[in-house]
Amino acid sequence: MVLATNSDSDEHLHSTFASRYVRAVVPRFKMPDHCMPKDAAYQVINDELMLDGNPRLNLASFVTTWMEPECDKLIMDSVNKNYVDMDEYPVTTELQNRCVNMIANLFHAPVGEDEAAIGCGTVGSSEAIMLAGLAFKRKWQHRRKAQGLPIDKPNIVTGANVQVCWEKFARYFEVELKEVKLSEDYYVMDPAKAVEMVDENTICVAAILGSTLTGEFEDVKQLNDLLAEKNAETGWETPIHVDAASGGFIAPFLYPDLEWDFRLPWVKSINVSGHKYGLVYAGVGWVVWRTKDDLPEELVFHINYLGADQPTFTLNFSKGSSQIIAQYYQFIRLGFEGYKNIMENCMDNARRLREGIEMTGKFNIVSKDIGVPLVAFSLKDSSKHTVFEIAESLRKFGWIIPAYTMPADAQHIAVLRVVIREDFSRGLADRLITHIIQVLKEIEGLPSRIAHLAAAAAVSGDDEEVKVKTAKMSLEDITKYWKRLVEHKRNIVC
């Protein structure tokens, strides 16, 4: 969906080196009347893409930006295969089923040796969450109907730190979203408060394994225990879904004793992003259910499209096969040992970056030691400059780092967040620390900050009052100003 209006008065693209092949201009918003040489088309597009950021330096995103050349070749060899043509590409379907079973076993699903796991591949965790939510809603409706109770007011309980896809699910499928508010120094869902919000209309409680804001793991074990007590008292049978989009490929390798998955009886489904720490390019996610009974059969479509019965549970139909194949490549290429080594290296680099940021003496570290390998940090003193200003200044070095405020009840906290992926080395961490220090030195003497302090001093001659006013203005006025200023360049928290 395009919401932008034409801001460029010039409605045509003018080729640079492509003028060797063609001199005609290319319309921006209409299909051209005539064809052009393939070399020229490539050059026109390539020239425009030069202004995109460097994916390797995009530290806002969890999404994988590098894979081995052998896997790149597999992807290109299968890029023309439509995944839904299962009868025509049976081996591709088999590879997906193998991936589902590998993930289910990794998450301790109670699957027998001769039993197939229940799950499917998706285009990402957003689709996976939609599917899991639909399954919960339908199961809740069945229970309510059997008891002769109304089914018109379903709700779901989450923390205020959930990714936007949960809000989409609630809005698209008419489910009330009940959010547990955050507080300063506690930026994840409180299990006790979540269980307090559960009522007879709650279709599930969503726990996050790896908050997008701070990388922290929510306490799924405590949530399970508290919910078990409430279910025993009320007979409601409220289940848990674990959104492990970021942490699902972290916890099994770094924290194997942490109980967050199907080892907990009230966890009924889990989603995970293959294109994050599953180490595959963008376009693949997974959802697995505890047992066959947790996915209502009526939601599974059996389609005889090209000569064979195709059971499918998806919001999409046609999609590429290459990411599924790439996921299988990573599983057999790396194995448990390989994934463990990569995740340990990511965490080591995160610690290195964290130590360097702490040594500046300018920041408070908001992220935790246990969780997704990232570093989230806020300024100790926002009276002279803001995190939005720092993020904007780091752009000149090529770094893409998001700055954002926390959700409701903690929105006065503004942070920077650096995601550590496999392709982020210790050398890059050291270089980023150097650039952060350089930016801090540069912006401390900016005229705009000096003018702001002078304006605050003019309000009152009392030094202590000036400090209070300056701090207040930093939190309320300066933050708002910089947010507006860089809004068009900021990255969505993903």
UniProtKB/Swiss-Prot annotation:
Q: What is its EC number?
A: 4.1.1.15
Write down the chemical reaction(s) this protein catalyses. Answer: L-glutamate + H(+) = 4-aminobutanoate + CO2
Q: Does the keyword Lyase apply?
A: yes
According to the UniProt record, list the residues that bear N6-(pyridoxal phosphate)lysine.
276
Tissue localization of expression is: Expressed in flowers.
Q: Which Pfam families match?
A: Pyridoxal_deC
Cofactor(s) needed: pyridoxal 5'-phosphate
| Any one Gene Ontology molecular-function term assigned to this protein's record | glutamate decarboxylase activity
- Give the enzyme class: lyase
Q: Which GO terms describe its cellular component?
A: plasmodesma
Q: Which GO terms describe its biological process?
A: glutamate metabolic process
Q: Which CDD domains match?
A: DOPA_deC_like (cd06450)
Alphabetized UniProt keyword annotations = Calmodulin-binding, Decarboxylase, Lyase, Pyridoxal phosphate
Instruction: Describe the function of this protein.
Output: Catalyzes the production of GABA. The calmodulin-binding is calcium-dependent and it is proposed that this may, directly or indirectly, form a calcium regulated control of GABA biosynthesis.
Q: Describe the family membership recorded for this protein in Swiss-Prot or TrEMBL.
A: Belongs to the group II decarboxylase family.
Subunit and partners: Homohexamer. Interacts with calmodulin.
Question: What protein name does the entry list?
Answer: Glutamate decarboxylase 5
Which taxonomic lineage does the organism of this UniProt entry have?
A: Eukaryota, Viridiplantae, Streptophyta, Embryophyta, Tracheophyta
The encoding gene? GAD5
